[in-house]
Amino acid sequence: MKPAARRRARECAVQAIYSWQLSGNSIADVELQFLSEQDVTGVDVTYFRELLSGVAVNAAKLDALMAPYLSRQLEELGQVEKAILRIAMFELSYRDDVPYKVAINEAIELAKVFGAEDSHKFVNGVLDKSGPAVRRKR
């Protein structure tokens, strides 16, 4: 699959995980609604589904992995930043096919697109500190 299709899958995953975090609906319902309502042309839909299910199933583990590296409590994180960091932590922890630098760079780019003004700096800082340890713990 082309890198652009994976990037689009990550962009869609941020939006869907954000919705899941706020709505409390099941990840299956969020996925179904997202795929039926959004244009997924050029999206690696298989990877999108893997990100959604992987983050949903492992959310508590992913949160525990990132917590020591946060400058504030997990509950104080913005929902967009939390979604982006969960995706990056999932890729670093469970996806050997995603190079370390790719996972971090993609998360930074997602934060630039979807996050608040300086959230990409925050995401970069968290992943710069946590990335090596998280990848080693696999």
Swiss-Prot record:
Pfam families: NusB (PF01029)
Family: Belongs to the NusB family.
Name by which UniProt lists this protein: Transcription antitermination protein NusB
HAMAP family tied to this protein: NusB (MF_00073)
CDD domains per the UniProt record, alphabetical: Terminator_NusB
This protein's UniProt keywords: RNA-binding, Transcription, Transcription antitermination, Transcription regulation
Entry's Gene Ontology cellular component terms: cytosol
Gene Ontology biological process terms, A to Z: DNA-templated transcription termination; transcription antitermination
SUPFAM superfamilies with a match to the protein in the record: NusB-like
Entry-linked NCBIfam families: nusB (TIGR01951)
Keyword flag Hydrolase: no
Function (record text): Involved in transcription antitermination. Required for transcription of ribosomal RNA (rRNA) genes. Binds specifically to the boxA antiterminator sequence of the ribosomal RNA (rrn) operons.
Name of the gene encoding the protein in the UniProt record: nusB
A molecular-function term among this protein's GO annotations: RNA binding
